[in-house]
Amino acid sequence: PDEADVIAIAGMGGETIIHILENAPWTKDGSHQLLLQPMTKAADLRRWLSVNGYTFTSERLVWDKGYLYPVLCVKGGSCPTLTEKQLLCGVKLADDPLYGDYLALHAGKLHKTAAGLRQSRREDAAQRAAALEALAEELEKERGSL
């Protein structure tokens, strides 16, 4: 732990990154900057980080082989409660040149998930679909204002 100031964990899923950090509690002491690049489950990773003693210092987006990935920079510290939009689309990405693309990507996924829920017979499916559509519309509105 004392041999590095910056630690990069990249190229794996958010769940795997969470597992690594759960087994390295010293990363929360505030003396290490973590560069995290989840290939999947970025929202789950953001949620876990925010409730487990990490604060977001910056975020950036990168295109790689046709995919858009977030790079999260965090360190130990308290984090305010994140909104669903922040969990999904990032905490510090508003100035990123690829942010509009990221919003469009997530809005499309939300619309697709909502359409699937509308086919469901589950009792809460319609309510959940409406919430996802509302979030998708919020993302599209923000993208339009960029």
Enumerate the predicted regions with their spans.
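Class I S-adenosyl-L-methionine
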Residues: 3-6, 15-146
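A short beta-strand submotif of the Rossmann-like class I SAM-dependent methyltransferase core
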Residues: 9-10
